[in-house]
Amino acid sequence: MARYTKEDIFRLAKEENVKYIRLQFTDLLGVIKNVEIPVSQLTKALDNKMMFDGSSIEGFVRIEESDMYLYPDLDTWVIFPWTAEKGKVARLICDIYNADGTPFEGDPRNNLKRVLKEMEALGFSDFNLGPEPEFFLFKVDEKGNPTLELNDNGGYFDLAPMDLGENCRRDIVLELEEMGFEIEASHHEVAPGQHEIDFKYANAIRSCDDIQTFKLVVKTIARKHGLHATFMPKPLYGVNGSGMHCNLSLFKNGENVFYDQNGDLQLSDDARHFIAGILKHAPAFTAVANPTVNSYKRLVPGYEAPCYVAWSAQNRSPLVRIPASRGISTRVEVRSVDPAANPYLVMATLLAAGLDGIKNKLTPPAAVDRNIYVMTKEEREEAGIVDLPATLAQALVTLQSNEVISNALGDHLLEHFIEAKEFEWDIFRTQVHQWERDQYMSLY
């Protein structure tokens, strides 16, 4: 990541004819928000004097205490590569602060920084994330609204003409590279109209920032191609949903602490403790990793998404997989997370779960090399394999009963997250869906 000073930003804004700056942040539900300012207000923004109404943002504060401040992270300065009508537009990602100058505890980005400090207190220097976000491309109607008509009928690793999203995907990659992303690969996914673009791992804050920027770029470029990009976990019945596998690693002084050349599978004791912590707390962090009603339509057998809490060195049916790379690339892949999740909240909970395993020297169960999807319930019980929550309602109950994951969110975020998601569940469970009409109207 480039390191910028205020003087660098003033100079670049002038040299590149920047006319507007988006001061970007993320709300409780993972939705990108921004306050756009003209370049004439850049000095005020860089002096941390830009105020906004926090009571209007999901999960922030009440109307009686609404004044909040945007503190830009100078190292997130980037100029959007697409052309604006009058000058260019730049972006700064911000942390949220209270009026008294203290970090706002309801800011997901600030909260992740808090958990990272707990990691540093244990002697680790970096928590790295390599995300694999998937998305669908749908056609839009004459009014620009998304339809359910897919852009192509391609499958895994297909080429054009089966992969009609190829040009759109290439343009997304080019725009991302102009913004400083190191793209490792892009390809068509298993389901028709489904795509994946993988970018290089980075520290947790940078990677979460990148995920949010990635979503914005994907949606923007798709729209230019007359398409609608969605990160909804399961937009269509009968095909794979979209996940966001998270490849995690802990570093100490530039060394990957998960790697031990002499360990079983060349994994260190800390790696095994970390895996055990992830498995122990997986049912509790599921509400955060899979935060929508729709998320649980993806977590069903038969569609390459994990439903069971287990781990393996290669097998892709468990929740946790250990990819083959070793040395500095040794990592723990958590496969349940979906792209509707707030990345800052997910990373806080995954880190807290893994650190709990390390602090308490938890031991993971035996690795499962069988296809869990074809195991009977009795076989799973004998192997100690438990199910992930099957609904958002179940996941919320499990979250509230888990002290480690609750503490990873903090009181403010936990309270407002539970409130928002219970409200979402209540709306869903009282709706009458088309499936019910098709199933019952003629029968009864």
Swiss-Prot record:
Residues annotated as domain GS catalytic: 108-444
Binding of Mg(2+) 1, residues: E132, H245, E333
Binding annotation for L-glutamate: N240, G241, R298, E304, R316, R335
PROSITE patterns: GLNA_1, GLNA_ADENYLATION, GLNA_ATP, GS_BETA_GRASP, GS_CATALYTIC
Site annotation Important for inhibition by glutamine: residues: R62
Boundaries of every GS beta-grasp domain copy: 16-101
Cofactor(s) this protein requires: Mg(2+)
Annotated protein name in UniProt: Glutamine synthetase
Organism: Bacillus cereus
GN (gene name): glnA
